[in-house]
Amino acid sequence: MKIKNSLKALKGRHRDNRVVRRKGRIYILNKTNPRFRARQG
């Protein structure tokens, strides 16, 4: 999982990316291609 300051650019890298908020953190999750996962930090 990548940790990035801004997820806006990462969101558009794959069409299945989803932006999810969990426990105050923002994640990008992708079930079809998990290597696109990221967390804002």
From Swiss-Prot:
Say if the entry is tagged with keyword Ribosomal protein. yes
Q: GO molecular function: any one?
A: structural constituent of ribosome
Keyword check for Ribosomal protein? yes
Q: Which domain of life is it from?
A: Bacteria
Q: Name one GO biological process term.
A: translation
For this UniProt record, give its keywords in alphabetical order, as a comma-separated list: Ribonucleoprotein, Ribosomal protein
Q: Name one Pfam family in it.
A: Ribosomal_L36
InterPro entries documented for this protein: Ribosomal_bL36, Ribosomal_bL36_sp, Ribosomal_L36_bact
Question: What are the record's GO terms for cellular component?
Answer: ribonucleoprotein complex; ribosome
Query: What PANTHER family does this protein's entry cite?
Result: 50S RIBOSOMAL PROTEIN L36 2 (PTHR47781), LARGE RIBOSOMAL SUBUNIT PROTEIN BL36B (PTHR47781:SF1)
Similarity remark: Belongs to the bacterial ribosomal protein bL36 family.
The record's section on NCBIfam families has: PRK00831.1
According to UniProt, the name of this protein is Large ribosomal subunit protein bL36
